[in-house]
């Protein structure tokens, strides 16, 4: 069974200072993320962990990791190879992929046509862009069924049994392959950590690199606005500290201290 895990190496935006977010709001290019470390999305980590756990239990499969972007994805491609993925592919492009789900889906579909697969797995959405459209567009281009918000799945020959989170609860489906599924991280699985020997072997492994021509995205960012994050607060007025303390006790704390 040939399985492709498509992921996006996301910048660790939590490392940005508040002043950098404020400066980014003055333009439309967003904050400078060129020096930020990259992260593997939580959804993709969950998908990889589920795949590796089933392989460990004896399910035969051939795993390929694919990412689109720049060289920052190489670290995670090698990380997945150290965990047991047989093949790693980087579709290199300088294009802004935040608002280009159709561009991403089209090139993944082209890879599938050149390298036939049984199952394509993505995350539900990235932390950068967050459009969540890529798996649906990919499935439409391939003519495959698509299931999103998948929390768990089990592979069985030509079928996949999956648990899909819906607004009404958890739905269990048994689907004939091929298919596209978008996995949702639910906090129950963790990506393993490869050993030093596996890391060294993956560092020497070949990664397939293919250049993809950049295109002007159909949707472009026109303006950025920094959302204010404020907590509700009540100001206590008083001439002295003692007066403020008395009001705090009488109006807010006294009733909470009563048995």
Curated annotation (Swiss-Prot):
| Organism annotation | Escherichia coli (strain K12)
- Residues annotated as coiled-coil are none
Q: In the UniProt record, does the keyword Metal-binding occur?
A: no
Keywords in alphabetical order, please: Electron transport, FAD, Flavoprotein, Transport
**What protein am I looking at?**
Putative electron transfer flavoprotein subunit YgcR
* MF GO annotations: electron transfer activity
Q: Which family does it belong to?
A: Belongs to the ETF beta-subunit/FixA family.
- What gene name does this entry carry? ygcR
Function, as annotated, reads: May play a role in a redox process.
């Amino acid at each position: 069974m040939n399985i492709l895990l498509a992921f996006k190496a996301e910048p660790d935006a939590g490392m940005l200072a508040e002043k950098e977010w404020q400066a980014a709001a003055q333009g439309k290019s967003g904050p400078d993320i060129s020096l930020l470390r990259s992260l593997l999305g939580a959804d993709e980590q969950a998908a990889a962990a589920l795949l590796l756990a089933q392989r460990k239990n004896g399910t035969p499969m051939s795993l390929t990791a694919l990412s689109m972007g720049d060289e920052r994805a190489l670290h995670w491609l090698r990380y997945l190879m150290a965990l047991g993925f047989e093949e790693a592919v980087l579709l290199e492009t300088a294009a802004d992929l935040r608002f280009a789900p159709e561009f991403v889906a089209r090139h993944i579909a082209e890879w599938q046509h050149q390298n036939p697969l049984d199952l394509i797995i993505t995350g539900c959405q990235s932390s950068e862009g967050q459009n969540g459209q890529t798996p649906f567009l990919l499935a439409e281009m391939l003519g495959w069924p698509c299931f999103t918000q998948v929390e768990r799945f089990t592979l069985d020959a030509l079928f996949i049994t999956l648990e899909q989170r819906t607004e009404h609860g958890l739905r269990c489906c048994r689907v004939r392959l091929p298919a596209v599924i978008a996995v949702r991280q639910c906090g129950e699985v963790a990506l393993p950590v490869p050993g030093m020997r596996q890391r060294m072997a993956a560092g020497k492994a070949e990664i397939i690199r293919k250049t993809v021509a950049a295109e002007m995205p159909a949707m472009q960012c026109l303006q950025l606005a920094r959302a204010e994050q404020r907590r509700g607060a009540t100001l206590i007025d008083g001439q002295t500290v003692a007066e403020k303390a008395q009001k705090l006790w009488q109006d807010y704390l006294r009733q909470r201290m009563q048995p």
